[in-house]
Amino acid sequence: MTEVIEKTIFELSSPGRTGVTFPDPDVPRAELPESLLRADLPLPELAEVDVVRHYMRLSKFNYSVDGGFYPLGSCTMKYNPKINEDMARLPGFAFTHPLQPVETVQGNLALMYTLQEWLKEISGFAAVTLQPAAGAHGELTGVLIMRAWHKSRGDVKRVKMLIPDSAHGTNPASSGMTGLNIVQIPSDGRGNVDLAALKAACDDTVVGLMLTNPNTLGLFDEHVEEVIKIVHDCGGLVYGDGANLNALLGIVRPGDLGIDVMHFNLHKTFSTPHGGGGPGSGPVGVAAHLAEFLPSPIVGILEEADDEQPPLFGFIEPKRTIGRVKAFHGHFGMLVRTFTYIAMHGPEGLRQVAEYAVLNANYLLARLRGTYRVPYDRICMHEFVAEGRVEGADVHALDIAKRLMDYDFHPPTNYFPLIIHEALMIEPTETENKDTLDAFAEALIKIAEEAKTTPDLLHAAPHKTPFGRVDEVKAARELVLCCWLPENYNK
Ligand SMILES: *Cc1c(COP(=O)(O)O)cnc(C)c1O
């Protein structure tokens, strides 16, 4: 294996090289106070081309959706159309400031207002906030809204949130952050919420249920309406984790199912870039009875249009708002990208997105089910979960995932959901063609063969990447962020 030891920018430095030429100042030169100056500031000295090549080289160590297939289950790593980027860079969007008077940013506000309306139409909810920064933040917002609703009715006994055992870890985390007790609800033999267990847990101390549908097994809950009714019958509300909305676009509206509040992951369903911790966006939609609790402000129409004037957009405060959850108005650049994506697709196109996402996942499932065990094996939605082990071979899901990197594929999500042993969670998304799906299926089939004949090839994988297998636990626990500092750096 070749382990590339990357030179740091300090090691590339050579005295006298420079990448910038400062223009002559247009103000009189002045002496800086001695106290502000340092004799020793070991900044690297490099030409522009050295810096560009350094970072370009580093960027190639990263896998990206622009570089290859990225079937990371639950994360919906679909291709991000470049027109989204063009629109987000339009100066009228990119160079406005959230503190500008509303009269000067009517276009931005019209975009936000229209996006709120479109998300309402797509999801079947009565009102939407665009503030939350990501899905998990949307969950926190939604749970705070649920609590505020109970409280407004004088119903203060409710302290429990019900969460299925297949849920994403953010669900218990965001409920826990608001001080609620988490009650785990098991799944039944077909991967649905276990109705008997749900009934047993429902009483007048329940705030609600956090439901992911389709769930993280990629399965549509066969009793979703009954699940929602059981929770409503005990006075609880149903939170919808909307991370899997990609499977439903134009087909099912969560609001129509009776879900009370839900977050959207714009960076998943609506193709805004994610990965690497970049900004996401997690708007929250609510049914009519929760609209007045939304975070403040939301974009509204201050003066209706008439024959001479377009409408005047501005900010309005919901009557019993839970308050602000984000500085300014959310991640506006993501809103522009989402607006563009929805406008480019239109209703028919969005429905096709869901249909092809589901078709692609079922195609892969059909190609792989003979090779890998699929514990809850029924028609899947936009993703499915297989077991990452091979009969008679000593390999784990992690070995299979790492070996896929040698075939130039991003590994699927592994070891989640927790209820599946050695989970490999595969989400191809709609943007991949049949050739790519076939190549991926063939790689996984070949790896299953290798697991039996040359298992050490898997144990030591990946072999082709700049770095081999890293100790992920150690990397997380003992994160070293400043290894680039020169040894003699004056701390
Ligand atoms: C991604 C995801 C979340 C969290 O969303 P973020 O935008 O990453 O915070 C929650 N639930 C499910 C099922 C997810 O896939």
Residue locations for each model-derived region?
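Short glycine-centered, acidic/aromatic-flanked micro-motifs in structured strand/loop junctions
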Residues: 132, 187, 211-214, 386-388, ...
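Active-site-proximal cap/loop segments of hydrolase catalytic domains
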Residues: 338-340
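General small-molecule cofactor/ligand-binding pocket signal
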Residues: 129, 183-185, 412
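Conserved phosphate/anionic-ligand binding catalytic regions in large, soluble enzymes, centered on
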Residues: 63-83, 131-139, 270-285, 289-290, ...
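A short, small-residue-rich loop immediately preceding and capping a beta-strand
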Residues: 126-132, 160-163
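Short linear functional motifs in flexible/disordered or boundary regions
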Residues: 67, 131, 150, 154-155, ...
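Non-catalytic terminal extensions of PLP-dependent enzymes
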Residues: 1-127, 144, 252, 302-325, ...
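Conserved PLP-enzyme active-site core in the AAT-like
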Residues: 107, 138-312, 319-320, 395, ...
